[in-house]
Every structure is written in C-alpha cells, then in structure tokens.
C-alpha cells in the first residue's frame, strides 16, 4: 500500500496500522496482525502516541528503559521528523533508553539519518545484528 503524506492527509490509528501491516516484512500473517496490535496496545505500561501518520507503541520498563515499535504509513521524510518528535516526547516522559527490533535492514537508515542531526544532546544508538537476521537498535536518548 502507498504511504500517505501526513502534511496532506492525516490518517487514524486503524488506517496507519493497516498500511504498516501491508508494508512490513513480518512472519505474522496479515489477518492476524491487527488483532495482535490491538492486544499489544492494551497491555499495562504501554503508551501509544501518533505523530503524523506514524504510531509509536512503547512498553515502559523500569529505570527509564522501554521497548518500542513504530507503525508507519507516512512518507520517508516525515517518518524521520515524526521519529525525532517522538524521541523528544519519550524523553519528556522520563525515558532514557529505548530498544526496538526489526527485520527490514532499510529501517536502520532512519536511525543513521537521525544521528546526523539528533534532536537532543548526547543522543545516540548502537545497532546489533541478530542471529535471526533481524536487527536490534538500542537508542540512548541523551541528556
């Protein structure tokens, strides 16, 4: 499915999730993905925030640490800006370190783009390749 420029049209959660499901390379069948997402967003200590046509799901842990994922239906340039806004939001919530995992290596490009001009001082990330072929990002939100 085509991405939708949030500067031209704002989508709702269901529309964003549907587009993200179609465009994500996942082992979960499409018909099972939406119920899984709906279950995930209702878990305790979970924060859901929409920035543009990107929905960020954060599972808050202890000591300012959390695991997050993004459901994106926005254009690439907006996805970068939405992500910058989100990490500032997460920092204001008291988060210090966020972790995410994904299978599509193109997503790591997003983190490299943000690291060139981070929205907060001291912000950085480390990328790890997983045995499964996926990747893990550990994002330090800085000062």
Residues covered by each model-derived region:
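Short amphipathic alpha-helix that is part of the acyltransferase structural core
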Residues: 1-36, 143
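Conserved catalytic-core motifs of GNAT/GCN5-like acyltransferases
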Residues: 117-138
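Conserved donor-binding loop and adjoining core beta-sheet/short helix segment
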Residues: 42-75, 142-143
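Short, solvent-exposed secondary-structure boundary motifs
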Residues: 34-52, 113-119
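Short, surface-exposed beta-strand/loop "edge" segments at domain boundaries and coil↔beta transitions
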Residues: 27, 55-56, 106-109
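Intrinsic-disorder/low-complexity loop/linker signature
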Residues: 8, 53, 63-64, 123, ...
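A structural boundary/capping signal
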Residues: 2-15, 47-50, 95-114, 130-132
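Acyl-donor binding region in acyl/amide transferases
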Residues: 61-122
């Amino acid at each position: 499915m085509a991405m939708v420029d949030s500067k031209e049209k704002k989508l709702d959660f269901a529309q964003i999730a549907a587009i993200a499901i179609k465009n994500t390379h996942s082992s979960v069948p499409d018909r099972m993905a939406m119920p899984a997402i709906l279950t995930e967003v209702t878990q305790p200590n979970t924060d859901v925030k929409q920035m543009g046509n990107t929905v960020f799901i954060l599972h808050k842990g202890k000591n300012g640490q959390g695991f997050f994922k993004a459901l994106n239906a926005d254009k690439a340039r907006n996805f970068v800006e939405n992500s910058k806004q989100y990490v500032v939001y997460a920092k204001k919530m008291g988060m210090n370190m966020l972790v995410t995992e994904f299978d599509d290596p193109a997503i790591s490009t997003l983190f490299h783009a943000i690291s060139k001009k981070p929205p907060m001082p001291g912000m950085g990330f480390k990328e790890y390749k997983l045995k499964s072929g996926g990747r893990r990002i550990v994002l330090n939100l800085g000062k």
